[in-house]
Design a protein with these regions (language model features):
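Conserved beta-loop-beta/alpha segment of the NTase-like Rossmann-fold superfamily
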Residues: 2-73, 109, 116-118
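Catalytic-core segments of class I nucleotidyltransferases/pyrophosphorylases
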Residues: 25, 44-48, 77-168
């Protein structure tokens, strides 16, 4: 992994030698989540119940779907959905739902060979979403609605909001 920064998929692939053949979590640091039960613990409960890949999601406004990876999913239980597809930053008219993937994932090691075969996409980067789109076709995959307040710290306003909320 001596290549320059090549996308989130590449970053995950670079960790393969540390992860081996075990399930693992991906936590995007620009998504700050304030919750009574940590977001990852919410996902672990679903995973520990025998489910495969688990993505954390929250509903976003229809006009905001174009800023996120959006899951196409079927409701299984309250707050839990089986993923049937993923769309990266769709237009509001093309979005299959309003459930945005919010930077907390539990993935299986089956993602690694898929990432190795993933052609660089937008900005010539290996996109994790492209590999996830294939993985959800091959393995049981679920979206768990995260109970908590999310702040997009990758956005200046979101960063300021998180700073103020956590400082009070």
């Amino acid at each position: 992994c001596a290549l320059p920064i090549c996308g989130l998929g590449h970053a995950v692939l670079c960790a393969q030698h540390l992860i081996g053949n075990e399930p693992f979590a991906v936590i995007l640091s620009d998504e700050v989540i304030d919750a009574d039960v940590p977001a990852l613990a919410q996902l672990m409960k679903v995973f520990d119940d025998g489910n495969g890949v688990v993505l954390g999601v929250q509903k976003v406004r229809r006009e905001d779907v174009s800023h996120y990876g959006i899951v196409d999913a079927e409701r299984v239980a309250d707050g839990l959905h089986r993923i049937v597809g993923l769309v990266e930053k769709p237009s509001p008219s093309q979005a299959p739902s309003r459930f945005a993937a919010i930077g907390r994932y539990i993935l299986s090691p089956e993602i690694f060979p898929i990432l190795e075969q993933t052609t660089p996409g937008k900005n010539r980067e290996i996109q994790l979403t492209d590999a996830l789109r294939q993985l959800v076709q091959d393995a049981p995959s679920y979206a768990q609605e995260i109970d908590g307040q999310r702040y997009d710290a990758g956005d200046k306003l979101g960063f300021l909001q998180a700073t103020v909320e956590f400082a009070l």
